[in-house]
C-alpha cells in the first residue's frame, strides 16, 4: 500500500473503533460465566475476533447482528484455544480456564509466545494449576485439581496479570481477596476491568495492595454498549493538531470515559492544542485543529499506547516530546522503542535516550523519499502513516492489514482526511 499527503490539507471526519480493552473483557467473561449477552458496537478487530473464537471453542453460541454480537449457551472446557497475537485474550483466558477447571492446550502467534507470562503462571500454579510449555512457547494447562482460596499476583510487569486473576477469582468464588505485589503498571486498565466486572454483578474494590472481589448479583442477560477506543483515537487527534488548519472531527468517543488514554485530550490541550469536545452535537465528538504546541511529556509506563502517538509531535513540533520510562515500550507487540527512534531519525529529528528518558525534537527539516514501513505492529504502522502524510512524502506500507488488530478501518478513515491511499 502506498500513501501520500501534502502535510497541510488535512480535514474531515473520522470514526474510531470500539475499545478492544472493554470488548475483549466483556466477551470472554460472558462466555466463561455463561451469561447471555448482547455486546456492541464492535469493530470486529483481530483481537475482538480472537476473543469471539475462544468462547466459540468453549461451546458458546454466537449470533452477529450488524455490529453487535449475541452470546448464549453453555460453557464446556475446550481441548484447544488459539489466542493469535492477542496478549489480552491470552492472559485473561489462562485465568478463566483455571477457574473453570479446564485441561486445555494453548496455541497462538510465535511473537506472543515470546512475551512475558511468568508472573501469571506462578500465581496460578500456587492455586494448583499445572503448566507444561511446548516447543512453540505456549502451554498445555491442567486446572482439574485447583484450590483457589489464596490469590497473589505480581502486577509490576503487566496489569493484565492482575486482570486475569480478578476475573478468575470472581468466577470461582463469591468473595475473594487478591494480594497485588509491586507497583502496578498501566493501572488505568484495571479500572476497565473493574467496570467490566460490574456489568456482570461483581464488585472489585482496591485498598492499597489488596483487591476484594465480591459477587453482588447474577444477571440473566447483560446489554453492553462498547465505547470508542481512545488508544486508537490518539493518533488521529495528534494528526489533527499537527496538520489540519481546517480541523478534523473524531467521532465515537465517550466524554466521561474511564479509559486511561482519554487523558490524551487534556495532554494536548495543556500543550496549547486547539482541541475541544463538540457541545453542539450529541455524538460525543472531538474537534481539533493545527496548533503551536508546547513540549509534551508522557510516561510510557502508564500510557504506552499514547507514547507512540505522541512521538510524532517530536518530529514535527519544535518543542518536541519527552517519553519517560521508554524501556516499557520494548515488551509490547514489537520493540516499539527502537521503532519510534528509527522513525524519528528518518525525518532528521534529534533523538536522545538516557536516564530513562527519550527526547525527540525536530532537526533539519527533511522530506525523505522512498519510505518503506516494514513493521507488523499496528500502532507503529498507524504512527508511520501519519508521519508520512504530515511530511508531504510518499511511503510504502508493507503490511497494512496488520492495523486490523485494533483499527480495521484505519486507512479508509485516513482517506477521509484527504490522505492519498493506493492499495
Model-derived features: where do they sit?
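Structural preference for solvent-exposed beta-strand-turn elements
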Residues: 1-423
Amino acid at each position: 500500500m502506498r500513501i501520500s499527503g501534502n502535510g497541510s490539507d488535512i480535514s474531515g471526519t473520522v470514526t474510531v473503533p470500539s475499545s478492544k480493552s472493554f470488548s475483549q473483557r466483556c466477551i470472554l467473561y460472558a462466555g466463561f460465566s455463561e451469561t447471555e449477552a448482547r455486546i456492541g458496537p464492535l469493530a470486529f478487530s483481530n483481537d475482538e475476533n480472537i476473543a469471539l473464537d475462544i468462547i466459540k471453542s468453549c461451546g458458546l453460541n454466537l449470533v452477529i447482528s450488524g455490529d453487535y454480537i449475541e452470546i448464549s449457551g453453555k460453557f464446556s472446557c475446550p481441548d484447544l484455544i488459539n489466542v493469535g497475537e492477542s496478549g489480552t485474550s491470552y492472559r485473561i483466558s489462562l485465568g478463566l480456564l483455571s477457574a473453570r477447571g479446564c485441561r486445555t492446550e494453548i496455541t497462538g502467534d510465535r511473537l506472543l509466545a515470546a512475551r512475558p507470562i511468568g508472573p501469571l503462571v506462578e500465581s496460578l500454579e500456587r492455586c494448583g494449576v499445572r503448566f507444561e510449555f511446548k516447543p512453540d512457547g505456549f502451554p498445555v494447562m491442567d486446572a482439574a485439581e485447583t484450590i483457589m482460596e489464596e490469590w497473589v499476583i505480581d502486577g509490576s510487569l503487566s496489569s493484565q496479570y492482575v486482570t486475569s486473576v480478578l476475573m478468575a477469582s470472581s468466577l470461582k468464588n463469591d468473595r475473594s481477596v487478591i494480594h497485588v505485589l509491586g507497583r502496578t503498571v498501566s493501572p488505568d486498565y484495571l479500572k476497565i476491568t473493574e467496570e467490566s466486572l460490574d456489568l456482570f454483578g461483581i464488585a472489585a474494590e482496591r485498598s492499597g495492595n489488596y483487591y476484594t472481589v465480591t459477587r453482588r448479583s447474577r444477571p440473566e442477560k447483560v446489554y453492553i454498549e462498547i465505547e470508542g477506543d481512545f488508544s486508537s483515537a490518539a493518533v488521529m487527534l495528534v494528526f489533527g493538531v499537527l496538520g489540519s488548519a481546517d480541523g478534523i472531527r473524531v467521532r465515537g468517543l465517550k466524554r466521561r470515559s474511564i479509559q486511561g488514554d482519554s487523558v490524551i485530550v487534556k495532554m494536548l490541550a495543556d500543550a496549547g492544542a486547539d482541541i475541544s469536545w463538540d457541545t453542539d452535537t450529541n455524538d460525543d465528538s472531538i474537534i481539533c485543529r493545527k496548533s503551536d504546541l508546547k513540549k509534551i511529556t508522557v510516561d510510557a509506563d502508564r500510557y504506552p499506547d499514547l507514547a507512540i502517538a505522541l512521538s510524532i509531535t517530536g518530529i514535527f513540533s519544535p518543542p518536541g516530546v519527552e517519553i519517560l520510562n521508554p524501556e516499557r515500550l520494548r515488551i509490547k507487540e514489537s520493540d516499539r522503542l527502537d521503532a519510534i527512534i528509527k522513525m524519528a531519525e528518518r525525518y532528521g529529528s534529534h533523538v536522545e535516550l538516557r536516564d530513562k528518558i527519550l527526547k525527540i525534537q525536530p532537526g533539519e527539516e527533511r522530506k525523505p523519499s522512498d519510505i518503506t514501513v516494514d513493521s507488523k505492529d499496528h500502532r507503529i504502522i498507524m504512527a508511520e502513516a501519519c508521519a508520512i502524510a504530515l511530511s508531504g512524502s510518499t511511503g510504502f506500507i508493507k503490511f497494512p492489514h496488520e492495523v486490523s488488530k485494533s483499527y480495521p478501518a484505519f486507512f479508509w478513515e485516513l482517506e477521509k482526511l484527504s490522505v492519498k491511499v493506493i492499495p
